[in-house]
Amino acid sequence: MSMQDPIADMFTRIRNGLSAEKEVVSVPFSKMKMEIANFLVNEGYIKGCSKGTTLAGHPSIEIELKYHAGAPVIEMIKRVSRPSLRIYKSHEELPKVYGGFGVAIISTSKGLVSDRKARDLGVGGEIIGYVA
């Protein structure tokens, strides 16, 4: 049986890893998930990410989770647009996550950007998810 929403699965693995206080979580590899992981590194929500392989030889992404004073840096990570219901917004309609303290991950024609950067560039796109 195939996975219906790989990005939602990635977010769930990160959430579960944080609640179990894991240092590293592994997710199956895809270019989009690697882009999202690099985005989270650049925004400071995770320590790092690297491409690896599972014991079965399948490519995977190793995500190093980040904690501050014993508490997870990521308080909330949520999938918004999903395969059965895509959510697109123009740059004027982009939401502020947690009153501007969080970040919306937006897939635009300029690549994967934060909601702030999309507003600055004047581009809209698909809202992949929210992180705070």
Curated annotation (Swiss-Prot):
SUPFAM superfamilies: Ribosomal protein S8 (SSF56047). Keywords: Ribonucleoprotein, Ribosomal protein, RNA-binding, rRNA-binding. One of its GO terms (cellular component) is ribosome. It holds the Pfam family Ribosomal_S8. GO terms for biological process: translation. GO terms for molecular function: rRNA binding; structural constituent of ribosome. Belongs to the universal ribosomal protein uS8 family. Part of the 30S ribosomal subunit. Contacts proteins S5 and S12. NCBIfam families: PRK00136.1 (NF001109). One of the primary rRNA binding proteins, it binds directly to 16S rRNA central domain where it helps coordinate assembly of the platform of the 30S subunit. HAMAP family: Ribosomal_uS8_B. This is Small ribosomal subunit protein uS8. It comes from Francisella philomiragia subsp. philomiragia (strain ATCC 25017 / CCUG 19701 / FSC 153 / O#319-036). The gene is rpsH.
